[in-house]
Amino acid sequence: MTNWATLWPNDRLFLSDTYQLIWFDIEADRIEHKHFKAQNSEDISMIPKGFVSFVDNRLPMCINHKGEVYIRVGSFDTAYYQKFGDLDVSDFDDQVLPPDRDFTFNKVVFGDVPQEQLDNQIRDLQSEVSILTSRNVEMNVRENDLLKKVSELEKQIRQSSHNYEKVVEDGVVLSYRKAGGLLNRMVVLNRRLVGQRFVTNQRRWENIIMGSGVHDGSSYMAFNFKESGGSLKVTFDFDKLQNLSPDDLLAMQIA
């Protein structure tokens, strides 16, 4: 495909403020959307830098080699180019224009835009604002949902790093203690808390206390029992263990 920049200079070829090349099919003060087309060129080096620096960071507009300046009005399919005037480009060479350069227009032809056209532009802009507002609301809702999910995941991660879960089976040991040279432990047997003492000379554990039954929702020290997936499970909560006071421990009953 031909790079339109190679056609410069040409009366109908214009350089826009976005460095697009604009081609006018007709010569008129007002160029409707159907009478112009644009091309994105990766190489506009053949266009003098004076023209390139003139359009840089300006309002939506375009200029040709003769200095004819057109202002872009509207957007999308309703956009058109309206001639603003003829700029003196006699010294536009391949040097970048100084930032304080003054520009002289030989003729200004840009007049008032018809009220009907202004009304159409206002409606188009209002429609765009409505669409953007709707999208912004959707994005805010989506963002809130994602933040909630992140918060839930962080909570699960914290819990998983501070808890240990195991299926309750006979013989699950919950705690050990040693007092007066005797070794004791708390286990679960037949879904009951059972205190046991180690008989040293017989090398076996014997039951000394039959405590309360364990079920979904019951607890013992830092252990919580719950039904899950058809099984009774016990969860050890490190955070809860850290927060138990001596009074809490003394008040605990297993019978």
Curated annotation (Swiss-Prot):
Compartment(s) where it occurs, according to its Swiss-Prot or TrEMBL record: Virion
Bridged cysteine pairs (disulfide): none
Top-level taxon: Viruses
GO cellular component, one term: virion component
Primary location group: virion
Keywords noted in UniProt: Virion
InterPro entries registered for this protein in UniProt: Tobravirus_2B
Function: May function by interacting with a small, flexible domain located at the C-terminus of the CP, forming a bridge between the virus particle and the internal surface of the vector nematode feeding apparatus.
Protein family per UniProt: Belongs to the tobravirus protein 2b family.
Protein name: Protein 2b
Organism (species): Pea early browning virus
